[in-house]
Regions:
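Histidine-acidic metal/acid-base catalytic patches
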Residues: 1-29, 53, 57-60, 97, ...
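Short, solvent-exposed loop/turn segments at secondary-structure boundaries
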Residues: 42-46, 75-80, 112-117, 180-183, ...
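Glycine-rich, proline-tolerant flexible connector loops at the mouths of alpha/beta enzymes
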Residues: 33-53, 106-112
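N-terminal small/glycine-rich loop or linker at the start of catalytic domains
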Residues: 1-6, 63-73, 105-108
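A short, structure-level motif marking secondary-structure boundaries and short turns
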Residues: 3-6, 36-39, 73-76, 112-114, ...
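Active-site acidic/histidine proton-transfer and metal-coordination neighborhood
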Residues: 14-21, 55-58, 75-169, 178, ...
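Conserved beta-strand positions in the central sheet of alpha/beta enzyme cores
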Residues: 32, 65-67, 102, 140, ...
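Active-site-proximal loop/turn and secondary-structure-junction residues that shape catalytic pockets
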Residues: 11-13, 35-37, 69-72, 105-109, ...
Length: 276
């Protein structure tokens, strides 16, 4: 088993050159593209994408996934514009060499039971998956707070109900902690067979504060060991959120991003997990 390290490089800096310099200094040869020059990935122009491709080639860095915001809208919002945005980010992913696109399963109205929206969410995610299939893309659904798929049971039910090869799961331990879920004990058994991608961030259960991997209650060490034992060979993507965290992204800065990368690399060394 060998895992591949990546990260949300816009947590380092809005500037792509500084992002790439910090990644390469920490021997991280992939990035998850969420934004560059403070432009969100779904809004990047063809000229932007060309500049990104050139900079990546010069730095020897590749794109592991598109960190899109697709599905981070209210469940009652019109779906058409979201399908158009997905087509655009799938095109960008194709140009940059990755089929993987992070997505979400829609914000549920505050105070309402998520189950009330189950069929609507399944229909919407099925429509996204159909677009992804046509573009040769793989949607990696992230468990995010306050969306339909925020707890493992709904994540698994969603993926199994849509039943498309284009809809898989990404695993975010910190988000599970912030939803009162034990990531390895409760979520991993339900989601392992659906996992195509793993986000690396940890959190404290009592406050929800995000901390480097292994320093919180996210059972990151246990999850990495289980992934090792199962032969997982996918991406581990750093999303540190060590300086700022919000519903549409986070920020760490170069020094804190390096601290997060080194914490993950130390865990991998402890667990004897090869990485590249």
């Amino acid at each position: 088993m060998t895992v591949t390290l990546s990260g949300f490089a816009d947590e380092i800096s809005p500037d792509l050159d500084e992002q790439l310099a910090t990644l390469t200094a920490e021997s991280v040869a992939h990035l998850e593209l969420r934004s560059a020059w403070s432009v969100g990935v779904a809004d990047l122009s063809d000229a932007h994408v060309g500049r990104i491709a050139s900079a990546l080639g010069e730095a020897g860095v590749r794109v592991s996934a598109i960190g899109s915001p697709i599905g981070k809208i209210p469940v009652q919002a019109p779906l058409g514009p979201e399908l158009d945005r997905l087509r655009r980010v799938a095109e960008i992913g194709g140009r940059l060499g990755t089929p993987i696109i992070r997505v979400f399963s829609f914000f549920i109205p505050a105070g309402e039971p998520p189950g009330r929206y189950r069929e609507q969410v399944i229909d919407r995610m099925g429509a996204l998956a159909t677009v992804a299939e046509k573009h040769g893309a793989i949607l990696a659904h992230e468990n995010e707070k306050e969306i339909y798929g925020d707890v493992p049971q709904r994540c698994a039910d969603l993926i199994e109900s849509v039943y498309s090869p284009a809809l898989r799961a990404t695993f975010d331990a910190a988000n599970f902690v912030q939803c009162g879920v034990r990531p390895h004990s409760d979520a991993y058994p339900l989601l392992r067979r659906h996992l195509v991608y793993v986000q690396i961030k940890d959190a404290l259960a009592d406050t929800g504060e995000v901390v480097p991997a292994g320093e919180g209650d996210g059972e990151v060490r246990e999850t990495l060991a289980a992934l090792r034992d199962s032969g997982f060979e996918g991406y581990l993507s750093l999303e540190p959120h060590l300086a700022e965290a919000g519903p549409f992204g986070g920020f760490s800065g170069p020094a804190e991003f390096r601290r997060a990368a080194q914490a993950l690399q130390a865990l991998l060394a402890e667990l004897q997990i090869p990485w590249r």
